[in-house]
Amino acid sequence: MTKKIAILGASGYTGAELCRLIAGHPDMTIVALTGDRKAGQPMASVYPFLRGAGLPDLVRIEDVDFSGVDLAFCALPHATSQSVIKALPADLKVVDLSADFRLRDPADYAKWYGKDHDAPALQKQAIYGLTEFYRDQIRDARLVAGTGCNAATGQFALRPLIENGVVDLDDIIIDLICGVSGAGRALKENLLHAELSEGTHAYALGGTHRHLGEFDQEFSKVAGRKVEVQFTPHLAPFNRGILATCYVKGDAQAIHATLTAAYRGEMFIEVLPFGAAPSTHDVRGTNYCHIGVVADRRSGRAQIVAALDNLCKGSSGQAVQNANLMLGLEETAGLLGLGVFP
């Protein structure tokens, strides 16, 4: 039986990506789309690429009848999601794409987001949505917290290595480049074409990026002790994609073997042959993450490079992957499309 889906906050980039993916899903149909500031408008007037997808018009959240909805995706901003989800029917399955439920400890949320959580009980119940590592818990979850796109990329590259003790836990560096869609659709001066094109810049320097909270939480959990990484994100003038280059101390061949073993049988994680490096071009529009390992012959370090699409595997695609599990569907349903090249 086809599952009925609501998307809350459908007028943002991740909401539109959910529409694109679910429009081609064999077992899901969208019955409600919300966008309070654009209520009453057809989705195709907001995103013309969705014309012909047969989507309902945008409405306000309070106008949605959730009685027949099997699962809701919440693509609202952080701090808004928690209050909205708290008010939803208690038996409604929810995949949240915001940052509101990623950190298990309310004190960690307050530290990184500058305010107390409005739904701490739900925060503690939420399952972290890094599918390949929380698959069993996600199947039985009522609320799944989508990962940060940067945090997901770094974890796919490093988590199996930390868990298996093949890298120095006290010397991990992540340099990451993200496309501009990662900053959202809101009008911001620094994202104007003339401000961003023909250049790139680092941001959230000095250990201030909020996704560090996810790295701290997840890496420390699998290591069994405190692990803190050095993380520097960069914003680049392309639309989609994340490329993370991770520098670690460890034997590169052993690192490659560990990643190959960890992801054997995983449909959406592809470990490239030793010495090869991935490109964001190859994963654009897909739910795949490509990982390469290279030995640095001068420093003795290993370089692990991971590429994914921040809107798909880094957010909406992974959200659909989690929803498939929560609804008892084939995990890969609606997600097997290849990228567009060139």
UniProtKB/Swiss-Prot annotation:
Spell out the subcellular localization from the entry.
Answer: Cytoplasm
Q: Look up keyword Oxidoreductase and say if it applies.
A: yes
Instruction: Look up the record and name the pathway of this protein.
Output: Amino-acid biosynthesis; L-arginine biosynthesis; N(2)-acetyl-L-ornithine from L-glutamate: step 3/4
Report the EC number(s), separated by commas if there are several: 1.2.1.38
Biological process GO annotation list? Answer: L-arginine biosynthetic process
Gene Ontology molecular functions: N-acetyl-gamma-glutamyl-phosphate reductase activity; NAD binding; NADP+ binding
Which EC class heads this enzyme's classification? oxidoreductase
What InterPro entries does this protein's entry cite?
AGPR_type-1, NAD(P)-bd_dom_sf, NAGSA_dehydrogenase, Semialdehyde_DH_NAD-bd
Keywords annotated in UniProt: Amino-acid biosynthesis, Arginine biosynthesis, Cytoplasm, NADP, Oxidoreductase
- One GO term describing the cellular component: cytoplasm
Can you tell me which family this protein belongs to?
Belongs to the NAGSA dehydrogenase family. Type 1 subfamily.
Biological role: Catalyzes the NADPH-dependent reduction of N-acetyl-5-glutamyl phosphate to yield N-acetyl-L-glutamate 5-semialdehyde.
Record's protein name: N-acetyl-gamma-glutamyl-phosphate reductase
Instruction: Give the species.
Output: Jannaschia sp. (strain CCS1)
The lineage, from the top, is:
Bacteria, Pseudomonadati, Pseudomonadota, Alphaproteobacteria, Rhodobacterales
